Amino acid sequence: LNKRCAGIGSFCGLPGLVDCCSGRCFIVCLP
């Protein structure tokens, strides 16, 4: 799943995932 967020993006507790948009984890989350 690809999600585009406006300047929001931080690593989740899961490897290979990025936390963005309402604290949800998405693969390859673009800032």
Swiss-Prot record:
The entry's keywords: Cleavage on pair of basic residues, Disulfide bond, Ion channel impairing toxin, Knottin, Neurotoxin, Secreted, Toxin, Voltage-gated sodium channel impairing toxin
Record keyword Coiled coil present: no
Superkingdom of this protein's organism: Eukaryota
Cell compartment(s), UniProt: Secreted
Keyword rRNA-binding: no
Main location: secreted
Tissue expression: Expressed by the venom duct.
Maturation-removed propeptide residues: 1-4
Annotated Gene Ontology cellular component terms: extracellular region
GO molecular function: sodium channel regulator activity; toxin activity
SS bond partners: 5-21, 12-25, 20-29
Domain commentary: The cysteine framework is VI/VII (C-C-CC-C-C). The presence of a 'disulfide through disulfide knot' structurally defines this protein as a knottin.
Role description: This toxin activates voltage-gated sodium channels. It shifts the voltage-dependence of activation to more hyperpolarized potentials but has only little effect on channel inactivation. It is active on Nav1.3/SCN3A (EC(50)=3.98 nM), Nav1.4/SCN4A (EC(50)=4.99 nM), Nav1.6/SCN8A (EC(50)=1.27 nM) and Nav1.7/SCN9A (EC(50)=2.42 nM) voltage-gated sodium channels. In vivo, it induces nocifensive or pain-like behaviors in mice when injected intraplantarly.
Family note: Belongs to the conotoxin O1 superfamily.
Name used for this protein in its record: Delta-conotoxin-like ErVIA
Organism (species): Conus eburneus (Ivory cone)
